[in-house]
Amino acid sequence: LNETLGKIKGPNRMLNSYYNLNDNYPNPFNSNTSITYRLYTDGLVRITIYDMLGNVIKEIVNEVQNSGYKRAEWNATDNLGQPVSAGVYLYSLEVGNFRQTKKMILLK
């Protein structure tokens, strides 16, 4: 579960030091989980939940944010507000050309 997938689009590999996506807590979780992250620069932030097939389940953050420590919550629902089934999900932080993805487990 500690596997981290990171991808920086474009030539600038230094972006990795400007953003940090932490492990969600709790993990595994039952109904709610917190996702914390740090921005060292301001930017348009997206945090998206995906199923293991890469389908978007829910976008929980999509806004310009100032630098600092941040937290987002996911209540195990999709974009329509419907509960999702138990299983493994991915969550991704995107800021500019930076993208980092981690896994989480929903138990019911």
Predicted regions and their residues:
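Glycine-centered coil/turn sites that cap beta-strands in beta-rich domains
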Residues: 4-50, 59-63, 71-74, 95
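Ser/Thr-centric signal marking residues that sit
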Residues: 33, 77, 101
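Short, acidic, Ser/Thr-enriched surface-loop or helix-capping motifs
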Residues: 51-52, 78
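Surface-exposed loop/edge segments in extracytoplasmic proteins
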Residues: 55-61, 100
